[in-house]
Design a protein with these regions (language model features):
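Bacterial N-terminal signal peptides
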Residues: 1-4
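Conserved beta-sheet core of the metallophosphoesterase superfamily
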Residues: 261-344
Length: 362
């Protein structure tokens, strides 16, 4: 029987749901490696050891986080669940990425991106998969052990598959959503892909009823999981909260003519803002999706360009980092240090491992 996390139901029920406490591995300070939108071509995959060696050789890295997109938006999906397999598909790609993840010495947390499921219907991905079938395949491979990370040395975490609200038993399907605590910081991942949160029609396999149901169920579950993370942070008197997801929910390219739009993120962003305001202490959001490294405070000023997009509450304590990804040079991973003894808690730098992902890494 699944253990339930009664987030938003009652404090007593929430306590019972998390009565089996997962002990943090570090009391005050830890360092993690974060990257996403990788590998975006065969050059990066063939040179995966450069990334692996760079991360594995850092003695302070205690965890690895991949924020989604395990191939580019012009590479095929796996035609999961389709027989015979779609000719243009690459059925073995996900397994190759899984094998690479397992070579990291530290626990690996991965949250799905749009390219490996949401966008598989697109012609630029060779119409090589049906979104829901591709998501099911991602879950069956990367999340085969609910409540455990990937990596050579795995780690137990809270998974929404086991810790879900009893009022919403269907949330158990979101095995990819995780929570853990380390260095007086609560970490949470949610499945929030690009392409306007799966808001784009599925081309030749479009089923609007199924797509809209998918968006609603997953986004609502993501919000409940986010609430659960902040509830845990309050109860444990955490110094900070870190959220990992794929989508750049303020991407200006998505708002430009012909862009994907950003409206399907608004409900989640508003809840994130509300939770950050209530929490008061530092909150860090890490995303990929738009590929170029940057950091900002997108909700600090409601009258700013980013503040106007979702009309959310002002949350000056929310910092956002977009990790370097795709084939942008140089190939980098983010070295994020969390030190609960410092006022800002977070510090980071980029570590290069590939000179030019498009041509030669060395």
């Amino acid at each position: 029987m699944a253990t339930v996390l009664a987030s938003g139901v009652s404090a007593d029920a929430d306590e019972r749901g998390l009565e089996r406490r997962l002990e943090p591995r570090h009391e005050q300070k830890t360092t993690i490696a974060v990257f996403g939108d990788w590998p975006y071509n065969l050059n990066l995959l063939n040179n995966a050891n450069l990334l692996l060696d760079s991360v594995n050789s850092d003695p302070e890295v205690s965890l690895v986080m991949h924020v989604g997109d395990i191939h580019s938006g012009s590479m095929p999906c796996t035609s999961a669940g389709t027989l015979p397999p779609i000719a243009a598909s690459n059925p073995g790609w996900n397994q190759q990425i899984f094998a690479a993840f397992q070579k990291f010495k530290s626990p690996v947390v991965y949250t799905p991106g749009d390219n490996e499921w949401t966008d598989c219907h697109k012609s630029k991905e060779s119409s090589s998969g049906k979104p829901l079938q591709e998501l099911a395949a991602v879950r069956s491979l990367f999340f085969a052990r609910p409540g455990w990370t990937l990596g050579l040395h795995d780690m137990e975490v809270y998974s929404q598959a086991k810790y879900f609200s009893p009022s919403y038993p269907a949330d158990a399907q979101f095995v990819e959503n995780m929570i853990w605590m380390d260095a007086r910081t609560v970490f949470v991942t949610v499945n929030m892909p690009g392409s306007d949160n799966d808001g784009l029609p599925w081309s030749s396999v479009e089923d609007k009823t199924a797509r809209e149901a998918e968006i609603a169920a997953r986004t609502d579950a993501d919000i409940r999981w986010l609430q659960a993370a902040f509830n845990l942070a309050e109860r444990e008197h955490a110094a900070a909260v870190v959220i990992g997801l794929q989508a750049d929910m303020w991407d200006p390219a998505a708002l430009a003519a012909g862009g994907d739009g950003l409206d399907r993120y608004t409900g989640f962003v508003r809840e994130l803002a509300n939770q950050a305001v209530r929490f008061r202490r530092p909150v860090l959001l890490i995303n990929g999706d738009s590929h170029l490294y940057g950091s900002d405070r997108p909700l600090a000023d409601p009258s700013s360009a980013t503040g106007k997009i979702h009309n959310a509450a002002a949350a000056a304590n929310l910092t956002r980092i977009t990790v370097q990804g795709s084939t942008n040079a140089p190939g980098e991973w983010l070295r994020l240090t969390i030190d609960a003894r410092t006022p800002s808690v977070f510090s980071w730098k980029n570590v290069a491992y590939c000179v030019d992902p498009l041509t030669s890494c060395k």
